[in-house]
Amino acid sequence: MIGTYGHGTENDFVLVFDPDNKFEISATQVQAICDRKTGIGSDGFIRIAKQDGKWFMDYRNSDGSIAEMCGNGIRVMAKYLIERGHQLPGIFPINTRDGMKFLSVPESGDITVNMGQIREVFGEITATTNGHTWTGYNIDMGNPHAVVFVEDLDQVGDLLTSPIVEPADEYPDGVNVEFVQFLDNGELKMRVHERGVGETKSCGTGTCAVALAAALFKSTRLPASWIINPPGGLLSVEIDAHSNAILTGPAVLKEDFDLSKYL
C-alpha cells in the first residue's frame, strides 16, 4: 500500500488512494503511520474513497479517531486528485462526513473550498490553559470549535495538553480550541489545539470558525473576509451573507511512501 505525504499550511497528512473501497484501516494502524518518531509522521490520515460515485474523504485524526471534516485536508486531497490524473481541474464535489463540499481547483495556485454554513451555538464557554481563563464562542463547523480572543498569544503557553473547556458536556467527543490575537494590520493571528492531535500548525475548519467568531466579536456585518495567520502560513476566509464559509489556501504534495510495515 502506497501513501502520499502532503500538507496545507503545514497541517500535514498521509493520503491513500482507495477508489474501490477495499482498504480497511484500524485506529492502531493510523496511529503507527502518523507517529512522528516511528512512522511517517502527520497530523492526520486521509483515505481517498468513493461514495455513490463521488469522491469521499475518509478523514482520521492522528490518534486514529474519526473526524467529520478537515478544511486543509480536503484541499490536499483535491490537489492529489488533479496531480495524479483522477480529476480534471475546475469545480467539483468531494463528500465528507459533514456533507458535500464544492472545491474550485485551478491547474496551479491556491485552492478554494466552500465549507458550507457555519453557526454559533449560543451559550458562553470558557477555555483555561497556562493559568489563564477566557470566555469565548462556541462555533459549529460540522465539528466543534471553541474560539477565544486574547491580547497576546504568548499568554497561551505551550499547549502540550488540551485546554480545559467548559461546559464540558457541550463537547462529549472533545473540541478544537482556537486562540486568536488581532494584529495591527487587521490579520488574525491564531494557534490551535486540535482534538485527537494536539497543537497543529494550522486548521482549516478552525480558521473558518475564527472568521465567524471575529465577525461576532467585532459586530461586523456579513459578508466579511479575513486573513488568518496560523503558524503554518496564511489562509483567507470569506463569510458570505448566509454564513457560508469560503476557505482559500495552498496545498502541497511531497513524496510517496510504502506503508506496508505499518499495516
Describe each model-derived feature in a short phrase.
Residues 117-136, 158-160:
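Active-site glycine-rich loop that binds ribose-phosphate moieties when present
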Residues 128-155:
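Internal active-site segments that recognize and position negatively charged phosphoryl groups
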Residues 117-119, 141-145, 251:
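Glycine-rich beta-alpha junction loops
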Residues 1-107, 146-263:
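A glycine-rich beta-to-alpha transition motif near the start of alpha/beta enzyme domains, typified by
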Residues 109-116, 246:
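Short, solvent-exposed secondary-structure boundary/capping segments
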